[in-house]
A protein has these predicted regions:
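Surface-exposed acidic/polar loop and edge beta-strand patches at domain peripheries
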Residues: 3, 25-229
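C-terminal motif of bacterial Sec signal peptides marking the signal peptidase cleavage site
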Residues: 20-23
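Bacterial N-terminal signal peptides that target proteins for export
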Residues: 2-12
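Hydrophobic helical h-region of N-terminal Sec-dependent signal peptides
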Residues: 14-18
């Protein structure tokens, strides 16, 4: 049975917030890689950048460590615009990482990765038999879940691509951007996307999505984090 997408989305935007408990002053923790550069004044918000390894295709990846004025920490990587770590205080005030993930890009490219923390799409979830009809035209997608298309498909799924990163001037956010060309994984239209992770001073981790396309196409982006609480 075909999956219809009758609605044209020219612009799609969404926001997700994770409310985090108030933090005590944290003990220091090791970063995933040695910082290469840092934004911030050292007394409040800060963003540190470090290498995260090379992909199998030889592309360099980076990891960004966001720290808010209360000491909470979030780590995100250019590979898949992925949330790698989120450090929160436990009942004793000690920081613990509550996100399941890997220490480098090799882990995310391995067989054991079940979309940990990544940005999934162009369409998250399954499209039955890898087919859909839009405006009277049938499209055939890459299949990667038996006969179905799952979380954007194969090697060019958003979760498997290296995104460009831009830290914010206020050291509270990192914006990842990517352009998926017309026909990639079988989808119509050139799709330009931005995913922004913001760690606020109110102890919120916010994820904002923006997508624009030049052709009718389905878009349904999300984050696939696993929480170890």
């Amino acid at each position: 049975m075909q999956t219809p997408f009758p609605t044209l989305f020219k612009t799609a935007a969404a926001a997700a917030s994770i409310l985090i408990m108030n933090a005590c002053s944290p003990a220091s923790e090791d970063n995933a890689g040695q910082p290469e550069s840092e934004t911030g004044d050292g007394d409040s918000n800060a963003i540190a950048k470090a290498g995260f390894g090379e992909t199998k295709a030889g592309e360099a990846t980076e990891i960004y460590t966001l720290t808010n004025k209360n000491g909470l920490i979030a780590k995100v990587t250019t590979y898949g615009a992925t949330l790698v770590e989120l450090h929160l205080p436990d009942k004793d005030g000690n920081l613990v990482d509550v996100i399941n993930g890997f220490d480098n890009v090799a882990g995310y490219e391995g067989e054991g990765n079940q979309y940990f923390g990544c940005t999934t799409g162009r369409v998250c979830n399954r499209i039955a038999k890898g087919k859909f009809t839009l405006d009277g035209e049938e499209y055939t997608l890459a299949t990667n879940n038996d006969p179905n298309h799952l979380h954007g498909g194969g090697d060019k799924a958003l979760s498997k691509q290296v995104w460009k990163a831009e830290p914010s001037a206020d050291a509270q956010a990192v914006t990842f951007s990517l352009i998926s060309p017309d026909g990639e994984e079988g989808y119509p239209g050139n799709l330009s996307m931005k995913v922004t992770y913001t760690l606020t001073d109110e102890n919120e981790l916010r994820i904002d999505y923006e997508a624009t396309t030049d052709k009718a196409t389905p878009v349904n982006l999300t984050n696939h984090a696993y929480f170890n609480l």
